[in-house]
């Protein structure tokens, strides 16, 4: 019975990876997946506001790639400004820039803390498995490279956050829309709407704004029709629903005299 339970858990982990993650989607027929033993894939719960690891330590590499399957987001933040520089939602991965696989050997930066902003369920995939798939599967190799590209483009959006609050918040939202669209996580269904678990504190730390200013910008974006107001219940309090992602481009490129709804001129 114990053996059957372990086998079931392993099969569930493989199924979750191959159906619910961008990187491993559709790879269930790979011989490597079919040959995984019971101890290879590690399912783990990361608790909120607890460090997972410190990224980019000199001559230090991770042993696993982390695949987010539920909860989150997981963030990376810089020192000393404590600015959020990466946000990962379910379906995405983190840790690839700290694995000695592909571009990971050259994607170095200064030490940065990685933590679960909210409780997160992950599957840890051994680096050896990632390396083998990278060498043997062209589609996997393409997706793996795209993960690095999306990280760079996310940070590029953040570099374009100006001191003008509407533009700064729009830059973050555009970064998330671009990231999740390319990962295939959103939008779901015929509507081009994007849902993000995005607390005000997280927006403030990513855009270098104070909390009150972020609240006012979100109200303005909602009144202008870019966002949809959520219900006041606790379960949806942190959800930001983008209903006009293309319209956000105008705010992203705006200067002070171009956003009529912002009261602070």
Q: Model-flagged regions — what are they?
A:
Residues 63-81, 89-92:
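Glycine- and acidic-residue-biased ligand/ion/polar-headgroup-sensing regions
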Residues 73, 130-133, 248:
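A generic structural signal for short hydrophobic patches within well-formed alpha-helices
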